[in-house]
Each structure stands twice: as structure tokens, then as C-alpha cells.
Amino acid sequence: MPTALEDYQKNFLELAIESKALRFGEFTLKSGRVSPYFFNLGLFNTGKLLSNLATAYAIAIIQSELKFDVIFGPAYKGIPLASIVCVKLAEIGGSKFQDVKYAFNRKEAKDHGEGGNIVGAALKDQKILIIDDVMTAGTAINEAFEIIAKEEGKVVGSIIALDRQEVVNTEDTEVLSATQSVSKRYDIPVLSIVNLSNIISYLDGRISVEEREKMEQYRQTYGASA
């Protein structure tokens, strides 16, 4: 029996569909897989959409009860996410989130002015939450870990908007999704606003039987074990 979606998750999915950030059809992914859905968080590109997106991230973070000092957004997509979610946490998260800081990396290190590779809060001796849109192969978070380790920070978790719950090719004998692989490799929780199971549950009755069957078939073919 699927877990009932919370209001913030329903709102997120509704806006994702309205903005066409979440689309259905036939899409060839970088992996070569043909997916019945495609997710592009970049289409959350208005003040209203960004505010609602930040609320969804913030509620997921608050409910996790994860303790951290800095939200780190890997360049480029993670940069606006880190800043808007930092603001939203201060607005709705109560006193313990008032002093949460944010930071992001430059793609090219700056050799003048303040210099360095990090913009925003210093990462040294800080507990870091990495924020991003999706996690496909885990490449971006691996790079983020290297950057944060170089700055002597400690990653305590990661959060993404959508967990596709798809298997990836790993060196492990286990068949794991990207989020499961990262969680196991770094021993951290990987949070998400929604996952593929949530999408399928939400769409029940909202799409045709044929479209739902394609979603279910895709999950059966590429889905990782819970």
C-alpha cells in the first residue's frame, strides 16, 4: 500500500505538471533509456513557483530532523536552490533555522578579490547539507564531496527534488538506485521531496490507463528495490 502523499508533495507535483517541469510522453535520457516521463526543475522559473519549490524542500528538511549548519548548492543548478531554501527555512522553520547558512562553489576558482572556489559561508568544521534537483548517476554529489572535503567540511546529508528510484551501474554486487548508492557509499541520508512511486500514486486517475501502464512498466524494468 503506497504511503499517502502530504499536502506539500501534492502541491509540488501539481505545480510541476502545470509548469511542464514534469512531462509525460517518450523521452530518451542520457543513459539511453527511453522514459515515459521527464523532469526539468529549471522550469520552476517564476517567483510563485520558486517560493512553492522552496517550501517543499524546506518542509522535507524540517521533517527529517537532520542537524546541519550550511546548505551547499553545487554549481550551477544547486546555487539558486541553496539560497531560496535557506530563506524559506528561516521563514517557516522556527528559531533553530534562523542561522542556517548557505554556500556554493564556482566552476572556476577566482584569483582576485576574496578569491577561492567557495561563495557564501565557510565550510570548515561545518555540517553540510547538499541540495540539488535530481540524482541520476551520483556524479555531481561525488564532485561536491570532493569540494567540501577540500574545505574541511563534513557532509551529513543530501536532498533532491525527485528520486527517480532507478538502478545505476555500480561496482557493488547489489542493484541500487543512485540515491541508495550514494547513501551507502557516504553513509548519509538522501532526502527527496517526491519519488517515482509518489508520482505514480499521485497520477492515479489523472492520466490514461495506457500512460499509467507505461509508468508501471518502466518502474518494473529499471526500478531499484526499496
Swiss-Prot record:
GO MF annotations, alphabetized: orotate phosphoribosyltransferase activity
Chain positions recorded as 5-phospho-alpha-D-ribose 1-diphosphate binding sites: 30, 76-77, 106-107, 110, 112, 132-140
Database matches in SUPFAM superfamilies: PRTase-like
Residues binding orotate, per UniProt: F38, F39, T136, R164
The keyword Acyltransferase appears for this protein: no
Short name of any one Pfam family annotated for the protein: Pribosyltran
Enzyme class per UniProt: transferase
GO CC annotation terms, alphabetical: cytoplasm
EC identifiers of the protein: 2.4.2.10
Coiled-coil segments on the chain, per record: none
InterPro entries referenced in this protein's UniProt entry, alphabetically: OPRT, Or_phspho_trans_dom, PRibTrfase_dom, PRTase-like
Keywords carried by this UniProt record: Glycosyltransferase, Pyrimidine biosynthesis, Transferase
Associated pathway: Pyrimidine metabolism; UMP biosynthesis via de novo pathway; UMP from orotate: step 1/2
GO terms classed as biological process: 'de novo' pyrimidine nucleobase biosynthetic process; 'de novo' UMP biosynthetic process; pyrimidine ribonucleoside biosynthetic process
Family named by the database record: Belongs to the purine/pyrimidine phosphoribosyltransferase family. PyrE subfamily.
Subunit structure: Homodimer.
Function (record text): Catalyzes the transfer of a ribosyl phosphate group from 5-phosphoribose 1-diphosphate to orotate, leading to the formation of orotidine monophosphate (OMP).
Protein name (Swiss-Prot/TrEMBL): Orotate phosphoribosyltransferase
Taxonomy of the source species: Eukaryota, Fungi, Dikarya, Ascomycota, Saccharomycotina
